[in-house]
UniProtKB/Swiss-Prot annotation:
A zinc finger (C3H1-type) spans 95-123, 167-205. GO terms for biological process: cytoplasmic translation. This is Zinc finger CCCH domain-containing protein 15 homolog. Belongs to the ZC3H15/TMA46 family. One of its GO terms (molecular function) is zinc ion binding. PANTHER family: ZINC FINGER CCCH DOMAIN-CONTAINING PROTEIN 15, ZINC FINGER-CONTAINING PROTEIN P48ZNF. Residues 252-326 form a coiled coil. SMART domains: ZnF_C3H1. Keywords: Coiled coil, Metal-binding, Repeat, Zinc, Zinc-finger. Residues 1-27, 325-373 are annotated as: Disordered.
């Protein structure tokens, strides 16, 4: 089927003009009212640019479809590739996060996502790898294979100018040693003495021992067990006597005599110091050296003898006397008999008062009768 011929410009303009007339049909005062004129111009602009808008919309739709198709193709490729990827096994004692996930390494979405036990970071293997402090990394990195033409020319020129100069020094860089001792040396460490241009060595010679490691080894000196120490001392003996009951008893007696002699010498020295006034004598020493000072004479009293024992009644009376002295300022409290005597005296005084009253009444009565007569 032959392709359709494109419309001419005149036909397109006629169609646009017709669309504008159809949309503005029936409007009054097209040439007088500003609002109507603005609406007409807006419709004309829409009709004029409708072709461009349709073209842009078509391009956007096409790009969207292409993107969806690409994603679909990628998912299909991933689904095929997932079945072929085999996850590496974790060796015993190795952290899984130090191993890069095979799916992530191949650029495929990991089916486990965040729950994956392997690392989703391409630098994980490099981070876990221990750096070698006995080799200078600058020598390995700066090889002739990595040189370009400018680098090659600079090396040749440098060799010409430095042929008669001294060879590179074998002295170890002090900044490198400090970084090793303080545990700051790593893949991203840079030497403060010029970085890669530092003239000193950035590696340790074979057999070099760090100060921290040396001090740690000195602190961790292995203690020899007592059994091994005894065996070593026994092996050093040149002549030895077999241990029997007789030799053991003789050795024990000698030790006892030596101990007694040492105690006697110490006692004599102590006594000599006391006599010389260099030190004072304790109570126990006074009793040991001169027991006569502690013998009782005739005036001594034995408080535990029966002569000084008191009965319970005497003790109670003594206690009562102490209690009464607390309230009477040393006086004696009145007894019950004293209370009875006081009561009798009061009764006698009352009786005397009553008799006096009776006598007075009788006298008054006699005086009244005498006056009546």
């Amino acid at each position: 089927m032959p392709p359709k011929q494109a419309q001419s410009k005149k036909t397109v303009e006629k169609e646009k003009k017709k669309k504008v007339e159809d949309k503005t049909f029936g409007l009054k005062n097209k040439n007088k009212s500003k609002k109507v004129a603005a609406y007409v111009s807006q419709v004309e602009a829409q009709v004029k640019h409708s072709g461009l808008q349709n073209k842009e919309a078509a391009l956007k739709e096409k790009a969207k479809r292409d993107k969806e198709l690409a994603e679909k193709a990628k998912k299909e490729a991933e689904s095929i590739l997932v079945n072929t990827i085999v996850q590496s096994k974790v060796p015993l004692g190795v952290d899984p996060k130090s191993i890069v996930c095979e799916y992530f390494k191949q650029g495929v979405t990991c089916p486990k996502g965040n729950r994956c036990k392997f690392a989703h970071d391409l630098a994980a293997g490099r981070k876990s790898e221990k750096i070698d402090i006995y080799t200078d990394r600058r020598k390995d990195e700066d090889t002739m294979e990595n040189w370009d033409e400018a680098k090659l020319k600079s090396v040749v020129e440098k060799k010409r100018t430095t042929e008669n100069k001294a060879k590179p020094t074998a002295i170890i860089c002090k900044f490198f040693l400090d970084a090793i001792e303080s545990k700051k040396y790593g893949w991203f460490w840079e030497c403060p003495n010029g970085g890669e241009k530092c003239a000193y060595q950035h590696c340790l010679p074979e057999g070099y021992q760090l100060k921290k490691k040396k001090s740690r080894e000195e602190d961790e000196v292995e203690e020899i067990p007592i059994e091994e120490l005894i065996e070593e001392e026994r092996a050093k003996l040149t002549k030895s006597t077999p241990v029997t009951l007789e030799t053991f008893l003789r050795w024990k007696e000698e030790k006892r005599l030596q101990k007694e002699k040492a105690a006697k010498d110490a006692q004599d020295k102590r006594l000599a110091d006391i006599k010389a006034g260099k030190t004072s004598m304790s109570g126990r020493e006074m009793f040991v050296f001169n027991p006569d000072l502690f013998v009782d004479d005739e005036s001594a009293i034995d408080t535990k003898s029966k002569e000084y024992e008191k009965s319970e009644e005497e003790i109670a009376a003594l206690a009562n006397q102490i209690n009464t002295s607390l309230f009477t300022d040393g006086g004696v409290l009145p007894s019950d008999d004293d209370d009875d005597d006081d009561d009798d005296d009061d009764d006698d005084e009352d009786g005397d008062d009553e008799e006096e009253d009776d006598d007075e009444e009788e006298g008054e009565y006699e005086e009244e009768e005498a006056s009546d007569e």
